[in-house]
């Protein structure tokens, strides 16, 4: 049950398991595409790697799972697919803009970008599909972006330039 986190943090986390390369692509207003890279060639762990996910895995946790799956660096195990939240939000604290000592005005969460796998597809609505599916306590419950009212549609962009991980096992043999 990982609802996500900060975009730059997940780029750095992914970098712990790959040498260098793209981690995620983001597209903002005007269809401007930006690729976020891990530029640190050091690898903290180069041994076997499994990513555990379920329907509650969303946003930044989907970026990590998708990137390591696209690199064929890790085997993703869990529910059929993750939450399917392929958007980046920023929180705007209204108290910073309107001074009112009587009560808390709250905040607005604004969607500013859509993110895409390095292989080009979005995780929006579809999530990250597990390589190996296992049942869990949420399997029978409809949870996900596709169950929300008026979700953004799934789409794809060109894939980023990346090389699959050349590691210790044949990825396809493990997941088939």
What are these regions (language model features)?
Residues 159-176:
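Hard-cation-handling environments
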Residues 2-158:
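Conserved acidic, small-residue-rich alpha-beta core segments centered on
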């Amino acid at each position: 049950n990982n609802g996500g986190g900060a975009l730059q943090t997940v780029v750095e986390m992914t970098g712990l398991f790959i040498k260098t390369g793209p981690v995620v692509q983001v597209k903002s207003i005007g269809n401007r595409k930006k690729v976020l890279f891990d530029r640190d060639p050091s690898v903290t762990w180069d041994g076997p790697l499994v990513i555990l996910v379920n329907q509650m895995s969303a946003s930044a946790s989907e970026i990590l799972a998708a990137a390591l799956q696209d690199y064929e660096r890790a085997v993703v195990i869990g529910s059929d697919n993750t939450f399917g939240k392929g958007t980046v939000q920023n929180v705007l604290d209204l108290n910073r803009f309107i001074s009112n000592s009587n009560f808390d005005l709250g905040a607005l969460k604004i969607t500013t970008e859509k993110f895409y796998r390095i292989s080009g597809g979005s995780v929006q609505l579809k999530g990250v599909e597990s390589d190996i599916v296992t049942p869990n306590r949420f399997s029978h419950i409809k949870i996900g972006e596709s169950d929300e009212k008026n979700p953004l549609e799934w789409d794809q962009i060109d894939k980023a330039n990346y090389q699959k991980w050349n590691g210790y096992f044949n990825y396809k043999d493990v997941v088939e």
